[in-house]
């Protein structure tokens, strides 16, 4: 999201609200379907790095750390919204009605499925969808493929790199 804020600033645009949905406690508990491209079950890493019953030190950044990083971009802080909690609990109730850029980076099947189900319909025509973990985690890929087959057949996912995929909503 820092790159988005910096890009908007470089374009002299400060009229966009930025929403950051995160637990700010590390990764949530994965399911059996969440397997890395290497074949390792996500639960193995989760247990090794477990911080609490439902969180792991993997990808941990506190809310204060993220706020501080976003502040360094110089983007209008009144336009940056930090939504704390599991996406399954905060979306759709705290999501904006209209989305121009939707970047999903929650890794797991259940969270990716939930995000797509509730946020893709809010993505504006011509809006950009980025699935960060499509090439890394089987769960994220499965959730994406299932959703697109049922709700957006024919949507072309362009490969960004080994992990990311990008699409433009028709």
Where are the regions a protein language model picked out?
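S-adenosylmethionine/decaboxylated-SAM
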Residues: 1-170
């Amino acid at each position: 999201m820092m790159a988005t804020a910096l890009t908007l600033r470089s374009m002299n645009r400060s009229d966009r609200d930025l929403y950051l949905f995160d637990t700010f406690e590390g990764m949530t508990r994965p399911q059996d379907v969440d397997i890395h491209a290497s074949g390792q079950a996500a639960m193995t890493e989760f247990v090794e790095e477990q911080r609490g019953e439902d969180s792991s030190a993997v990808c941990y950044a506190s809310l204060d750390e993220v706020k501080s990083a976003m502040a360094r971009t110089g983007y209008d802080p009144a336009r940056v919204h930090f939504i704390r909690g599991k996406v399954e609990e905060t979306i759709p109730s705290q999501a904006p009605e209209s989305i121009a850029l939707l970047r999903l980076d929650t890794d797991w099947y259940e969270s990716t499925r939930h995000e797509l189900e509730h946020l893709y319909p809010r993505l504006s025509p011509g809006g950009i969808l980025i699935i960060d973990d499509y090439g890394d985690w089987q769960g994220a890929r499965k959730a994406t493929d299932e959703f697109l087959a049922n709700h957006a057949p024919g949507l072309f996912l362009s490969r960004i790199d080994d992990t990311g995929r990008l699409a433009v909503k028709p």
